[in-house]
Curated annotation (Swiss-Prot):
Modified residues annotated as Phosphoserine in this record: 254
Gene3D superfamilies, A to Z: Classic Zinc Finger
Keyword hit for Metal-binding: yes
Zinc finger annotations (C2H2-type) as residue ranges: 430-454, 460-484, 490-512
Protein name in UniProt: Krueppel-like factor 4
Role summary: Transcription factor; can act both as activator and as repressor. Binds the 5'-CACCC-3' core sequence. Binds to the promoter region of its own gene and can activate its own transcription. Regulates the expression of key transcription factors during embryonic development. Plays an important role in maintaining embryonic stem cells, and in preventing their differentiation. Required for establishing the barrier function of the skin and for postnatal maturation and maintenance of the ocular surface.
Subunit structure: Interacts with POU5F1/OCT4 and SOX2. Interacts with MUC1 (via the C-terminal domain). Interacts with MEIS2 isoform 4 and PBX1 isoform PBX1a. Interacts with ZNF296. Interacts with GLIS1. Interacts with BTRC; this interaction leads to KLF4 ubiquitination and subsequent degradation. Interacts with IPO7; the interaction facilitates nuclear translocation of KLF4 in dental papilla cells.
Lineage: Eukaryota, Metazoa, Chordata, Craniata, Vertebrata
PANTHER family linked to this entry: KRUEPPEL-LIKE FACTOR 4, KRUEPPEL-LIKE TRANSCRIPTION FACTOR
GO biological process, one term: cellular response to leukemia inhibitory factor
Amino acid sequence: MRQPPGESDMAVSDALLPSFSTFASGPAGREKTLRQAGAPNNRWREELSHMKRLPPVLPGRPYDLAAATVATDLESGGAGAACGGSNLAPLPRRETEEFNDLLDLDFILSNSLTHPPESVAATVSSSASASSSSSPSSSGPASAPSTCSFTYPIRAGNDPGVAPGGTGGGLLYGRESAPPPTAPFNLADINDVSPSGGFVAELLRPELDPVYIPPQQPQPPGGGLMGKFVLKASLSAPGSEYGSPSVISVSKGSPDGSHPVVVAPYNGGPPRTCPKIKQEAVSSCTHLGAGPPLSNGHRPAAHDFPLGRQLPSRTTPTLGLEEVLSSRDCHPALPLPPGFHPHPGPNYPSFLPDQMQPQVPPLHYQGQSRGFVARAGEPCVCWPHFGTHGMMLTPPSSPLELMPPGSCMPEEPKPKRGRRSWPRKRTATHTCDYAGCGKTYTKSSHLKAHLRTHTGEKPYHCDWDGCGWKFARSDELTRHYRKHTGHRPFQCQKCDRAFSRSDHLALHMKRHF
């Protein structure tokens, strides 16, 4: 005997919830028989258990997708058999096709799995609690949630019911810790569908590029996990069912069977893209190709040239190879031999310091290349030239000299010529003939000034007003005149004092020492 519809049944009918008899693929009598037998006869439940897409709606049995999701939750909770309501009349076939064309199944599925409307959640929670208390279910009672939230029991394909205990043994996602499912479950299916976002979240899920995953290495039994880590972006709202647990699930293998797949839910807001950062080995870029880099301070010695001997060069000014190559007249350099190792030249003793060794870049050339040398005392770099006429390269801008075909031969150093290259001492030819003096001078003017000391002649007079001083030498008058003007040209470098005479400054500097 049917009872009159209650408030919960009216609310379900107002929300366009169909009868659960429409979910079966056969008539009502066959559906009742299959439900009593406990066989999984609902295709919608099977697709949810495998986390696959929803199949097309059966002809003649249209229903609302959101209502179907809520009804599946009620049946899994154990209240599906007792919940009654008004059945929706089937629509004609043409209207069914038009209705199915207007439905976006991917969008509805993703939104229904993420967060259902509060009104429908409250209605279904109240009806589920009332129905579960009135009539028992064939699969066993399940604890209804106290709050208006959903717990989606996603079970394996061959798990018809829930385990006794209230939370369900086959649950994959939930607030309470659930034991592993009884049936083997491959996470390759979850790799296609996000735990909480559906197919829409699949489009927003960032995956790591296989290029940036380290290569597979053989692992001992139980030695750890190496494989592909896929970061699942969880788009659930705060406080929802799938936003709280942070679980990393591991499958037995990837779709190709080479390595396991690890799925980690990400609850940190919108999905982020992983920056593709590739680390490469640091390579030294030199102008000489494969040879070692040359610095200004240390430079390898020269090897034997096939056309001549080594080239000596002085240490200063030390000019780097980069400066040589950056000059205007530089030639393209050739790569060094692969087996090159710098060592001091054989023609130089080992006791010389490194700075005294010849500073010529090591190069081996077989062929008819022209070698050229700079002037003695300047750094020389011999570079090959592929033309018929060679050119000498001396940094930065020394004159070029053409050499006959031959080898790089060092030139003999030539002595420099200058004004004071040889010592010249003037002889004192001017001697004072005054009795008892005997002084000699190199200049006649000095001797003439000296004779004034003997004769007492003072031809230099001070013309300052009121001053009648006379002097035998002009430099003495100049120093005297500074007393009237106050001019002190000799400044002390240690302090702020200045003097009018240089000898006075020399005496003053002895105090600082």
